A protein has these predicted regions:
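Conserved NAD+-utilizing ADP-ribose enzyme module
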Residues: 10-16, 20-36, 62, 73-164
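Extended catalytic/binding region for NAD+/ADP-ribose chemistry, centered on the ART fold
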Residues: 53-77
Length: 164
């Protein structure tokens, strides 16, 4: 099974040279595209709801995203090389991000514009943790439509293939 990581086109304002990734491996410092990471939106709440039984390596500050299907070229491709790859429900991350948008737009909208009808941030973070699966579990059951795949360690450079 391969995972994929988009490379933003070179003529884009946000292009990051993939050569860094090919030299050093893929990690939070060498990503070529930002993906959603619901666990890092409200770190204080995320930490409060984190089970004490979870491994220490689950640290959203170092996590970065990937995809299950090949995106539009160019992209990076690598095998699922580790058990430090987890899947969360991306819809929950989107709902959490609505709170970020609400805070940003509060002066203009009066607050609550993006979050009306949503559960509290705390409830969403709790649901986010409950949605956590290993990549194998997700592939076996596919309990939600939009997976948020997060990798919690560096993908070794020797495993990465650049597809142009």
């Amino acid at each position: 099974l391969y995972l994929y990581h988009t490379v933003i086109e070179q003529d884009s304002d946000i292009h990051i040279n993939p050569q860094n990734t090919l030299n050093e491996g893929l990690n939070i410092r060498t990503v070529t595209r930002l993906y959603t990471n619901g666990g890092d939106l409200y770190p204080e709440i995320t930490d409060r709801f984190k089970s004490i039984n979870l491994p220490k390596w689950i640290d959203f500050k170092i996590a970065f995203g990937a995809e299950l299907v090949p995106p539009t070229k160019p992209y990076l491709r690598f095998p699922t090389f580790s058990d430090k790859i987890l899947v969360f429900n991306q819809d929950i991350s989107s709902d959490l991000f609505a709170y970020i948008e609400d805070e940003y737009m509060e002066e203009e909208t009066g607050g609550g514009y993006f979050t009306e009808g949503l559960p509290s941030k705390e409830d969403l973070v709790s649901q986010y943790w409950e949605s956590m699966l290993t990549i194998e579990e997700y592939l076996n059951y596919k309990p939600y439509k939009e997976p948020e795949i997060l990798i919690f360690e560096t993908v070794p450079a020797k495993l990465i293939e650049y597809i142009k």
